[in-house]
């Protein structure tokens, strides 16, 4: 193989590797992750929602007891 041909092949290999690496990082930044987010599945979020519901229930009961 001649040196010029070998040089072109190596340059094309490096260039294609760079493009693939750049594209894989760029695609990860553009497309959203299909997995569930960590916050939506965490027990802290569920506990906070339950606490808010409990507080609303207490306020509702307190408002009803004041009417009576």
Curated annotation (Swiss-Prot):
Annotated localization: Mitochondrion inner membrane
GO biological process terms, semicolon-separated: mitochondrial cytochrome c oxidase assembly
Species of origin: Saccharomyces cerevisiae (strain ATCC 204508 / S288c)
Family under the similarity heading: Belongs to the COA2 family.
InterPro entries reported in the protein's UniProt record: Coa2 (IPR031459)
PANTHER family per record: CYTOCHROME C OXIDASE ASSEMBLY FACTOR 2
Main location: mitochondrion
Name of the protein in its database record: Cytochrome c oxidase assembly factor 2
GO CC list: mitochondrial inner membrane; mitochondrial matrix
Top-level taxon of origin: Eukaryota
Keyword set, alphabetical order: Membrane, Mitochondrion, Mitochondrion inner membrane
Function statement: Required for efficient assembly of cytochrome c oxidase in the mitochondrial inner membrane. Seems to be involved in the SHY1-mediated step of cytochrome c oxidase maturation. May aid in stabilizing an early COX1 intermediate containing the nuclear subunits COX5A and COX6.
Membrane topology: Peripheral membrane protein
